[in-house]
């Protein structure tokens, strides 16, 4: 059974990311399953699942650039910044297309963004949504995020379709809310689809019904990608049997030629063995994470 690798799934609207993880854990029999970047229940699209030792790769995947297609609905603001929340403002007005085009540049590049009150951001040790549900009004500090692309795809008032490419930690719900505030109409996020997570575009994702059938029939392993696919930008160091034994016991291996930064160690078949870090002036590769026993 393949207990080391990735499944890139097209998450449907409805389940939480944690529910998807639980279903896959039960359906595959793999005891350790995690995800590399939460998608809200009402969002669909690319969700990267990590199996077995590959859960230790989530730190490299969760911080990658994400791409989304979003629907912003003007005229109504909500407490959750999406369609689920209590309405807090109803202006009944949608801005003109030219007004939107004029303000979009303000939301590109480095942007100060305050997370939604209903989010998993910690406030004094508790998640913001827990405080909000208890009737508190959590004070969330703004954070700097980077929006590298923000394109107007179409506009049929009151609904604006956007394409967004952004850094990890960007809340598209906050982007929708902030657009409404800037245009003085109010707005909320009416739809969201993640079209890329790091190196994985939507067209590489397995449709959820296909994965469900695969789990029912015992053929889910066909959808497992090699763990090395999570690290396409890292240089590869092919390790021989001697190096394999050294890494197994946490020992460094020679770097030939001298190197810097981090790399991935693979065997002759391309299987990921470890994440390496250059030490001793680049003459050695020290194993930062080892994925075999």
Residue ranges and their predicted role:
Residues 1-12, 18-35, 39, 43, ...:
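Accessory RNA 3′-end/elbow-binding domains used by RNA modification enzymes
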Residues 1-168, 172-205:
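Catalytic cores of RNA-modifying enzymes
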